[in-house]
């Protein structure tokens, strides 16, 4: 088995069972293409999401080190910060979140609703900053201060996107390969590409388990020239830790994130409304709405390798719908 080294890494069981992989019949009829969805939005803690896969590995490492505090960073409406805080609460750990307002809004819903509201329910210690210009350094500075107060902090990077955290999506590739055994001729997998860990983990796993399947990352914050090196760096780091080679090219589409990270756009919001009205599935304005817009346009523009079925990775994010009202 090519991924057998994965079992060497301690893993905290947070999800419990494979997330569903479902066929979307009404969307498929609408688009004229078989569309499947991997429901990582329904992982079991705090309204779900993909970051729990990363936290299974990262928090296991934190506990191994004897940490009593998890420190991480993100936007005010970060899904990653929300899930990290929830896991900390579940385990009786302290959580400190370094937050920025990346869109510079004064809208009350964005500042207080959605994921931000949930952070208060989890008793998260909030530290605001003007901008996460160098998040690794900023997190380390914060950790030093927290440690001086008598805590034992463990730093979790933005998005949980380290090589260790991304092992969660190598693990996900195993699930996908097994669940797709009955999907005839799967052509492509589409995922939002942001902090890059989810994309890179899938890239390593799928290269070795489903080498004929095309993986497309739809960027949500950066142009290809800036995003591709981030994905490749993590891809190679993951492969190195698993004693594998990673030679698959990284495919990115950057046509769908404008005007910028965290700012809704028309195509993304149309995708959110379409999935809700056709399938009762909730996407979000920041990640999955834009990724689905890429999938829809990719079919229209014939950007995929062939006409086979497409699998969409639903990474979660529905709490942001409340924060972005009245945009939705």
UniProtKB/Swiss-Prot annotation:
Cofactor(s) needed: pyridoxal 5'-phosphate
Reaction it catalyzes: D-cysteine + H2O = hydrogen sulfide + pyruvate + NH4(+) + H(+)
GO molecular function annotations of the record: D-cysteine desulfhydrase activity
Location of N6-(pyridoxal phosphate)lysine modifications: 51
CDD domains from the UniProt entry: ACCD
Group of enzyme by EC: lyase
Annotated EC: 4.4.1.15
Any single biological process term in GO: D-amino acid metabolic process
Top-level lineage group: Bacteria
The keyword Transcription belongs to this UniProt entry's keyword annotation: no
UniProtKB keywords: Lyase, Pyridoxal phosphate
Keyword Repressor (UniProt): no
Signal peptide extent: none
Family: Belongs to the ACC deaminase/D-cysteine desulfhydrase family.
Self-association state and partner proteins as the record states: Homodimer.
Function of the molecule: Catalyzes the alpha,beta-elimination reaction of D-cysteine and of several D-cysteine derivatives. It could be a defense mechanism against D-cysteine.
Protein name: D-cysteine desulfhydrase
Gene: dcyD
């Amino acid at each position: 088995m090519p991924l057998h080294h994965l079992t060497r890494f301690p893993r905290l069981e947070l999800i419990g069972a494979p997330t569903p992989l479902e066929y979307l019949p009404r969307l498929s009829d609408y688009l004229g293409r078989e569309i499947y969805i991997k429901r990582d939005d329904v992982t079991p803690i705090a309204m779900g999401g993909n970051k729990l896969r990363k936290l299974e590995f990262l928090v296991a490492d934190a506990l191994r080190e004897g940490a009593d505090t998890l420190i991480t960073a993100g936007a005010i409406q970060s899904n990653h910060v929300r899930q990290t805080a929830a896991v900390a609460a579940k385990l009786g750990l302290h959580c400190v979140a370094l937050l920025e307002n990346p869109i510079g809004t004064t809208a009350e819903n964005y500042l207080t609703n959605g994921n931000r509201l949930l952070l208060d329910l989890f008793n998260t210690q909030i530290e605001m900053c003007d901008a996460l210009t160098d998040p690794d350094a900023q997190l380390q500075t914060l950790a030093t201060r927290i440690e001086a107060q008598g805590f034992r902090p463990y730093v979790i990077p933005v998005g949980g996107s380290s090589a260790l955290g991304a092992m969660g999506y190598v693990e996900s590739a195993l699930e996908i390969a097994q669940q797709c055994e009955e999907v005839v001729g799967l052509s492509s997998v589409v995922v939002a590409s942001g902090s890059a860990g989810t994309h890179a983990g899938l890239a390593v796993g799928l290269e070795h388990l489903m080498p004929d399947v095309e993986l497309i990352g739809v960027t949500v914050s950066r142009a290809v020239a800036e995003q591709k090196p981030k994905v490749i760096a993590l891809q190679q780091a993951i492969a190195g830790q698993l004693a594998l080679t990673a030679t698959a090219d990284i495919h990115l589409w950057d046509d769908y994130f404008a005007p910028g990270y965290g700012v809704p756009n028309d195509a993304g919001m149309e995708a959110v409304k379409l999935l809700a009205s056709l399938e009762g599935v909730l996407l979000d304005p920041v990640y999955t709405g834009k990724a689905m817009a890429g999938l829809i346009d990719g079919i229209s523009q014939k950007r995929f390798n062939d006409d086979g079925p497409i699998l969409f990775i639903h990474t979660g994010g529905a709490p942001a719908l409340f924060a972005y009202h009245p945009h939705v």
